[in-house]
Amino acid sequence: MWYLNRGGGLDMNVIPAWMEGITGKGAVVTILDDGLEKDHPDLVQNYDPLASYDVNGQDSDPSPRYDMIDSNRHGTRCAGEVAATSNNSVCALGVAHGAQVGGVRMLDGDVTDAVEARSLSLNPHHIDIYSASWGPDDDGKTVDGPGELATRAFIEGVTKGRNGKGSIFIWASGNGGRDHDNCNCDGYTNSIYSLSISSATEHGHVPWYSEACSSTLASTYSSGAVGERQVVTTDLRHSCTSSHTGTSASAPLAAGICALALEANPNLTWRDMQHIVVRTARPQNLIAPDWQTNGVGRNVSHSFGYGLMDAYAMVQLARNWITVPEQHKCEIPAPHLLKPIPAKSVVVLQLQVKECEGVEVLEHVQAKLTIFSQRRGDLNIQLTSPMGTRVTLLAHRAHDNSRSGFNVWPFMSVHSWGESPFGTWQLEIHNDGRLLGRATLQNWSLVMYGSKQFLPTASHNGDPIRISKNKTFNKKKNKNKIKNKHSSKLITTTRLPKIQNKSKFKPNNPGLTNKKESISNKKDSNIISSKNKHLVNSTNSSNKNKTPLISTTTTDVSPYFYAVSNSNPIQKIKLDQDSVRQYLKFVKNITITYPIMIPSRDAVKTYNTFKNNQKLKEKSRDINTSRNVKVTLQKTTEVPTVKTTAQKGSLGK
């Protein structure tokens, strides 16, 4: 299990959490898939019948349907990654081997809106984490998402699940990289309610199947090209496998890591978990051409999100976490327009945001667009925040010949996490169509989710830091609240500017080989602690005022902290630790960001071509590079059919 025990920053830092007795005990994880072999010797001890159901067969037994090719092995494989039992000399060891695991059999039949909704809403006060490694077809031309019932299940889950703390939905980002797919066209991974997880190969490269998009939050290890190691887990008929693959394998690893964090702090909300992932994910040793530093100093990539999940760092931060303030939302519509976008041209729109009640620190940003297009795949959409963070909401999709366009589609980005919403946002829509390939933007709006400023960490002995109302971050400014206080500027040109589209990683591009860049990472977990390994157990309160600020992770950090002023223009200020301590006493108009990390950069490795002749509507998300086969589960009223003579898990999410 190379992805758990390599050391040197080349694994997900799980073993240090185990050494402190954190195994996921008390957490309940359910795998939404094609069934679960509940009597598997590596799963039976941790199997939870209250977290299981057969939606396809309408009974309480989630056992998979067996056939000659073991086509329903996918869910059992995912479950073993989460909670395979320890010390039994069977297959493997689950990331959260102390957690309870269940399965929902829902992919082995008609995958309707009602089936999805029932699966997503199973026993929400008992189940903590739902892990899903499936989604719409990753063919580079499909745009699809949850229906009305499933959307309602998501909302009910995050608002009422876990007795109000919110269900945690982990989703595989997709395997459409070979077809230049974009996971922002997948309404499940594009949802603010899901924690979207991508993959990294054992050498830290972007896998050939990976989809790049701005909604990916973080990554875990999985398979790569031929010859690179894959994931070890349980398999059907009480057997084992060392060839679980794709983003299908990444999502359950993330679910297991989140279960560890829940044992450390069962009171974490669904938004707390996303904040902790953002603040602890490690970008170093992950190689991608599009790493950038956002407006508050966090490194982020369309391929890896904020980096590789770090289990021990998440556990440490969770122990001292103070629940984030209530989520607020505001929508800023652009003035009504019906703007043509001729072929070979770009339209640039600016939207001034002067007011967004309750949102001072951004989490998710959505750009809702209605666009008609002669060819949807010719569109490229980019959004730039007031703090300069530029994201690709949609990259060109060569296989997308649809004329349907987008109807109020919510393109989502997490790249501005922690930034201020105020200022000028810029939307660029590029149309690379042929002479008659015209497009028309009917309307668009920005939807911003976030909260007021907060300090979400606790003191070194586990007691919460109390900050009086007159010492909160970013004191409220006196301002006149005027509805619809925004403006829009329109700039149009028929000449297509020279741009560099970095949203889609193409590992077979020789121009990327041996490219080296230095990327700083300002880790943002400001925990006050005497030692990094004793965040909770320390009881020496006499040194409380002498304790320096350090990162929760075990990686190297610089001694410098930064602040961002609320002045106009915004300024970045370097602080030493003494200044930070003084700052905590007189918090007013600046916001602390975090210490710098410099990740190593290596040569980008090309990938071997993998042939794929089948197209799916609904499928699992795992890849087997040794067998060119696929099985499909139709999201229609048709009976699912076997497209080849191999197992379903061989190709998909």
Positions of predicted regions on the chain:
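Extracellular S/T/G-rich loop segment that most often corresponds to the catalytic His/Ser-adjacent loop
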Residues: D33, D186-E263, N267
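Subtilisin-like peptidase catalytic core
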Residues: D11-V14, G26-A27, I31-D39, Q45-E156, ...
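C-terminal subdomain of the subtilisin-like protease fold in secreted/lumenal serine endopeptidases
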Residues: L122, I127-S131, G166-S167, Y193-S196, ...
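Beta-strand signatures of extracellular beta-sandwich domains
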Residues: N380-T384
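Noncatalytic modules at the cell exterior or secretory-pathway interfaces
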Residues: E419-I429
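Mature extracellular/periplasmic domains of secretome proteins
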Residues: P16-G24, M68-N72, L93-A96, D110-A132, ...
